[in-house]
Design a protein with these regions (language model features):
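Ligand-binding clefts/hinges and TM-proximal coupling segments of bilobed small-molecule sensing domains
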Residues: 4, 10, 117-141, 197-226
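Short loop/helix-cap segments at secondary-structure boundaries that form the rim of catalytic
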Residues: 75-77, 129, 167-170
Length: 226
């Protein structure tokens, strides 16, 4: 997979922090961007996007700091370092495969004959699907449109991430498989889904400072849960 030259910081002293609109991401990064912690003069600005868009932007080297899928990180490690704080780990819970019909006796075998709407080919969700049933066909659909795609009959099944994992039943859809639970049964381990990365060309000193700021931002959120 090819990558493009990295982009410089657009304005001196301003660091773009990109993440999904999920509440857990906002929780992690809010104190950094809202001026609630001492960042030593480093200014952070939020940029929101779905995880596949963030994966692609990081692949192009556009962002200083970003949430990414751990599947995508395999293609990013040469230019981004994985930060130690704020990873997304599924403990017997993860991306969910749903369909209009109730689950058959052997969902895994049935999926080999299905067209599955997926949220992106760089997502960890997609990687787990390929491990679970490599014969399944897929079509890439925006993560927040997958339920509609399945309900309307444009795909046989959907691979859900974010809030769709919780709301699919409201659309009359049925759970066929939970990739986090499947992964646990296979490995007895939690499923690593995503993490935060920082661009290596910022230099070790600034990278370490950003890592400290992210840790402090998470600690601030934990101390101010209201």
């Amino acid at each position: 997979m090819t990558t493009l030259p990295v982009s410089p910081i657009p304005h001196p002293g301003i660091i773009r922090v990109a993440h999904s609109p999920d509440a857990d991401d906002a929780f992690m990064f809010w104190a950094m961007a809202a001026g609630k912690i001492d960042t030593g003069g480093r200014r952070y600005v939020h940029e929101l996007g779905d995880i596949e868009s963030l994966n692609r932007r990081a692949l192009a080297g556009e962002l200083e700091v970003s949430a990414v899928s751990l599947h995508a990180y395999a293609y990013l490690a040469d230019r981004y370092a994985l930060l130690a704080h704020g990873a997304s780990i599924g403990d017997r819970y993860g991306p969910r495969i749903v369909a209009r019909e109730p689950a058959p006796r052997d969902p895994r075998a049935a999926l080999a004959r299905c067209l599955i709407a997926v949220p992106g080919e760089l997502t960890t969700a997609f990687l787990t699907l390929r491990l679970y049933q490599p014969a399944a066909r897929h079509v890439v659909v925006a993560f927040d449109q997958i339920e509609d795609c399945v309900a309307s009959g444009n795909a046989d099944a959907g691979l859900l991430i974010h809030e769709g994992q919780l709301t699919y039943a409201d659309r009359g859809l049925h759970l066929w498989a939970d990739m986090g639970e499947w992964w646990y049964q296979e490995t007895q381990l939690p499923l690593p889904l995503g993490g935060n990365v920082v661009r290596r060309d910022l230099g070790e000193s600034l990278m370490r400072a950003i890592a400290r700021d992210l840790k402090a931002s998470i600690e601030y959120g934990l101390a101010h849960r209201d």
